Amino acid sequence: MTTTPILILSGKGKTGRRVAAQLDRRGVPYRLASRSSERRFDWYDESTWADTLAGVDTAYLAPPVGPTGLTQAGKFIAQARGLRRLVLLSGRGVGSPGRDFAVYDGQLELESVVQASDLDWTIVQPAWFAQNFSEDFLRYHVLAGELRLSTGTGAEAWIDTNDVGDVMTTALLDPAYVGRVLPLSGPRTLTMTEIAAELSTAAGRTISYVDLNPEAHVAEMLEQGLIQEDAEAVRDLFAVIRNHRSEYVSDGVEQVLGRPARDFTDWARETAKTGVWDQ
């Protein structure tokens, strides 16, 4: 078992928290890195990078969403002296047709930086996280009773972030996954109308889907406090769903963990019990 801590960037995000919890259960030391951690880390402040890397040789990296943040993550990897093992969180379908957007270009460039490095790398490419509806910006929509989004009639195989965390942890600790790209998804695809129906059943009240055109969606995200670059990144990520480019299932969870990925229905039912959608 490793005696040096595994670095988790960004350690307080949805996947980072779950990787940390799994490492805790296994007795593996780790170091959380974020703007509010003991060793302050900021993607946009390069003076924080060296101290964060001191004394570690293995890292899990969850980069920022927007193109600027992805560029910074690439610079960080290029300067990561002493690092030898890296597991990177990317996005499903990076490099595939129909993804001619800046955010996908940034993800593809970052993957290329990792693959061209001297690191022992693994790239994990999950579908959209189900927990966006309970822990992130989509929770607001559920509480409001309307999913005001721009995915049209396209479908996505939404994945439980706990499955992603389990795969990430396994990849960090098992050298069998060095040099591999692991696409992950839930067990079936769902349109946003179907998602709304699932959430309605789980929450015990009506939640509907309101389809916005992409630019109207950007305008609403800006009103909700997102910066322009991040709002445009979300728009472009949703455009892939809208254009029916994400309607397939990936079996990476079963390949790595030896069990099926958790279904959205089961996730929604259990999540509703926590009260996160109560009004």
Language model features: what each stretch is:
Residues E215-Q279:
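A hydrophobic C-terminal alpha-helical subdomain
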Residues T2-L32, S36, Y44-S47, A54-D57, ...:
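Oxidoreductase cofactor-interface core, primarily capturing Rossmann-like NAD(P)-dependent enzymes
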